Amino acid sequence: MSVSALSPTRLPGSLSGLLQVAALLGLLLLLLKAAQLYLRRQWLLRALQQFPCPPFHWLLGHSREFQMNQELQQILKWVEKFPRACPHWIGGNKVRVQLYDPDYMKVILGRSDPKSRGSYTFVAPWIGYGLLLLNGQPWFQHRRMLTPAFHYDILKPYVGLMVDSVQIMLDKWEQLVSQDSSLEVFQDISLMTLDTIMKCAFSYQGSVQLDSRNSQSYIQAVGDLNNLVFARVRNIFHQSDTIYRLSPEGRLSHRACQLAHEHTDRVIQQRKAQLQQEGELEKVRRKRRLDFLDVLLFAKMENGSSLSDQDLRAEVDTFMFEGHDTTASGVSWIFYALATHPEHQHRCREEIQGLLGDGASITWEHLDQMPYTTMCIKEAMRLYPPVPAISRDLSSPVTFPDGRSLPKGFTVTLSIYGLHHNPNVWPNPEVFDPGRFTPGSARHSHAFLPFSGGARNCIGKQFAMNELKVAVALTLVRFELLPDPTRIPKPTARLVLKSNNGIHLRLRKLQ
């Protein structure tokens, strides 16, 4: 009697054979992947022969040098040794070429390379694909559509709203400060800049500074997302969306995104309800000034269609973040720079008091009559650029002015922090010297890039500069800014330049 091929006595042998085949296939796939990684590494090394860099680990790259919160200090060391460019190995097969030279910056910013798929992609769950993340024709369409929201006629009345927001913050400080105590200013400044963007861009009635319960959770979410995105870029195990979603950091990021979206969704829904009552565009225009959100809601794409709900929220999320967090960074570091350089602070105060007279307010007409204060603002942004770096993926080969070249497919990081601290570009770069920005002084067109440059420069740079001037002017006529020697800020690179230990200042009320 024959034994069936499916009988129990045959199963162990069959299973063993299947396991052997599976193991062999797994080993083969592993060898193929290893060969692929080896070949890619060799290609990267050949492509970077013209770009020397410090020694790096075969698997971890430069990760030991770029520990969390130590990146800026490392960049300063590299700029000294490699003043034009330096490859930064994130892992054994992942590298970004950091650029520190204005000629190199000019070449890249004059091209149309897309934003880097790596770090910028990690921001997408938060701010969506709005003006910051879009590339190519969609970016061009959105940029052209949003430009009217930053026209002179729209920006001019915003100054009064900026004044209101700054005065609320200063009134609060007047109640809080005592002669010997110090204040962590970044959180209050963040609330103030959020208040400003809510009033100017979204016509918010009231003040988020006075009723800050919802706004505090939004600001906390933005702070968390800044840290989480930055950490994810540098964690080779978190490059996978699936792995990241399952990690504690991924779950925290998801919750922070939800909080941020709840804030922006609430703003959009309130405006849509208001516009349903107000009617068509011309009726609205006759009643009140149009703001950023009006421009978005009434805008038409080239095919005649309105923005989708997804595109609308992406633009609101983008502008809400960029319009308050980068400006808060700028204001905070400017205050710190002035606090540590009292002679320049005193000269700014004299200029502002001479301009405003007995009136403590500031108007649109005053903004171009503060040359020395503007020089100090720019010098502070050179030392502490609000956005420390931006990245591009090369869509075609590039050759730099010194003859060195990179092939298509490389990611380049334009280190604005490195550029602004490059001794080949700025002599004695760590010295605070507003004279560098004396009107008419000569410098490279791409030596100073606090708002990026080229076609993709910051669309809201004039709005931001106006807000910086208003905040500095009104603060200096009410307070003397003094440093807290026990808590010196430690600049740290995130999406926006922050301090690892906050920005603590002593405020002395002026009589």
Swiss-Prot record:
In its UniProt record, which GO terms are filed under biological process? arachidonate metabolic process; icosanoid biosynthetic process; kidney development; lauric acid metabolic process; linoleic acid metabolic process
CDD domains, per this entry? CYP4B-like
Task: Please give the Gene Ontology molecular function terms for this protein.
Answer: alkane 1-monooxygenase activity; arachidonate monooxygenase activity; heme binding; iron ion binding; long-chain fatty acid omega-hydroxylase activity
Instruction: Name the cofactor(s).
Output: heme
Question: Catalysed reaction(s)?
Answer: an omega-methyl-long-chain fatty acid + reduced [NADPH--hemoprotein reductase] + O2 = an omega-hydroxy-long-chain fatty acid + oxidized [NADPH--hemoprotein reductase] + H2O + H(+)
GO cellular component annotations of the record: endoplasmic reticulum membrane
Give the subcellular location. Answer: Endoplasmic reticulum membrane; Microsome membrane
Q: TM segments?
A: 11-31
The keyword ATP-binding is annotated on this UniProt entry: no
Q: Which UniProt keywords apply?
A: Endoplasmic reticulum, Heme, Iron, Membrane, Metal-binding, Microsome, Monooxygenase, NADP, Oxidoreductase, Transmembrane, Transmembrane helix
| Membrane topology annotation | Single-pass membrane protein
- The UniProt record gives the binding positions of heme as E322, C458
Which residues are the signal sequence here? Answer: none
> Which EC numbers does the record give?
1.14.14.80
Point out the propeptide residues: 1-4
Q: Which InterPro entries match?
A: Cyt_P450, Cyt_P450_CS, Cyt_P450_E_grp-I, Cyt_P450_sf, Cytochrome_P450_Monoox
Question: What is the similarity comment for this entry?
Answer: Belongs to the cytochrome P450 family.
Output this protein's name.
Cytochrome P450 4A5
Question: Source organism lineage?
Answer: Eukaryota, Metazoa, Chordata, Craniata, Vertebrata
The primary gene name is: CYP4A5
